[in-house]
């Protein structure tokens, strides 16, 4: 997969070919057709939110499901999807009611687990 990868803060993103692992239980692989780099990414790129590097940026995306992991039933390969990954605690009242986008702990950047970048 080709991805925009941050390898060092305050440096331009690099477009790299990366390896991907197969999807695990309850995960899907999406062939991303378009992705945005937003203010969250900008804060990471500038070192405002320290993160382990290298990191794939662009967590707001649209694409096509290409592979399902075990247990996935809501989508199937060929489905068009949009997503915006946001970290969430899984325990607050919003997460407990399925509204993870409102999670009160979502700005805790230690919870951000994005794609790890490994060169192909």
Feature-to-residue mapping (PLM):
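Extreme N-terminal starter segment of soluble prokaryotic enzymes
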Residues: 1-2
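Extracellular beta-rich ligand/substrate-recognition surface
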Residues: 5-12
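Generic structural detector for well-ordered beta-strands
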Residues: 17-19
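Glycine-rich beta-strand-centered segment in the early N-terminal region that forms part
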Residues: 21-35, 45-96, 101
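NAD(P)H dinucleotide-binding glycine-rich loop of Rossmann-like/cofactor-binding domains
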Residues: 43, 89-120
